[in-house]
Amino acid sequence: MLKSKVAIITGGTRGIGYATVKKFLENGAKVVLFGSRQETVEKALASLKEENPDWEVSGAWPSLADPEAVAQEIEKIRETFGRIDILVNNAGMSDSTPIDNYTAEHFEKIMSLNVSAAMNCIMPTVKIMKEQGGGCILNTSSMVSICGQPSGVAYPVSKSAVNGLTWSLARELGPS
């Protein structure tokens, strides 16, 4: 099902993102994983190549907060592979900071990584997917987007925004 599909997976160096990268590779996809730092991307790539040297996997570390850097990296991927079939927005940051210890900067940092970064990846990718006649965008969310959590208010708020983004994109792009 994923044979020869080209996928970008953000937050692909550890946890859910790394497991997603592995599953896509096991099913024949060509994967470009995004991570926050060169060292973590290179470490993940080395581990994946050690497990299966035949897997088609590469990595990049654009600042997901920078829409231009993200767009440039996504365009490079399109130029390399000729298409982008799947975007998995998995990069994110959890939080358990009590509200009385919050700052506006802390709240914005979480919203930026969990919501704005996804949009920064979606915008250039949607254009490519429309040009090629389709694609798939997956956004990682959390149950706390529905039920909240006892502290770290920005995390459930950000994941609620991701849900709204996902539902809106499905309604806008799904019919096409």
List the model feature ranges, each with a label.
Residues 13-15:
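Conserved glycine-rich cofactor-binding loop
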Residues 27-43:
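Conserved glycine-rich Rossmann-like NAD(P)H-binding loop of the short-chain dehydrogenase/reductase
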Residues 127, 171-175:
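Alpha-helical segment proximal to the catalytic Tyr-Lys
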Residues 142:
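Residue(s) in the substrate-gating loop at a strand-loop-helix junction
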Residues 100, 147-153, 157, 175-176:
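Active-site loop immediately N-terminal to the catalytic Tyr-X3-Lys motif
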Residues 122, 158, 166:
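Active-site helix of classical SDR
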Residues 98-99, 106-108:
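Substrate-binding pocket helix/loop in short-chain dehydrogenase/reductase
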